[in-house]
Amino acid sequence: MVQADQPSGPSFGPAPAADGTGEGAALAFRDVTCVRGGRVLFERLSFAVPPGGAALVTGPNGVGKSSLIRVAAGLLRPVSGEVGGAAVRTLMGEAAALDSARPLRRALAFWAALDVEPADPQGRVARALHAVGLAHIAEVPVRLLSTGQRRRAALARVVASGAGLWLLDEPANGLDVASVAMLERLIAVHRAGGGAVLVATHLPIALPDAQTVMLG
């Protein structure tokens, strides 16, 4: 287990490279400190996630789990330390970030066309919709989706991206038991193909052999 106030050693996977790029790791934090609103959320945090690996960010509500995900995504700048890694990353946050007026398929295709994997965006979207069990509502406007369907649509966006590193912020929120099992299967398939995941959650998710990053 990695704790924010104690830099981790190499037992948690490939250590971040000396130049801070985390060469060989999908994601690497080296001595990262994050401050928001004058409050230190985590300090001198170091860990690395190798290809095929997983890290589970845990801790009480408000401790900084979502901020850590945002730092990993490049959306929040740490006050010190370095964030690196070889993998292209994609983010699943609380909001699906899909055009509510468009049919689900077209809303996902908009993002798929911009993603790291340029080939066959329509095909990638179709496969992702099938994977999350939403193929039957592909032509339904996003605004008409239920909360659980919107969460699965957000996951479909991640699946269709082709990114090597999935950054998942509370991915089980709004999902029933069957959908959480589906999420776990998709993560397992992604990891088996060499992909990596960083998951922040307060709900139980099965992540075999995942390292734990404890905040708070």
State what each model feature region is:
Residues 2-51, 56, 77-80:
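A short, flexible loop at the N-terminus of ABC-type nucleotide-binding domains that lies
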Residues 73:
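Helix-to-loop junction immediately C-terminal to a conserved catalytic motif
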Residues 141-148:
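Conserved ABC ATPase signature
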Residues 158-159:
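ABC ATPase C-loop
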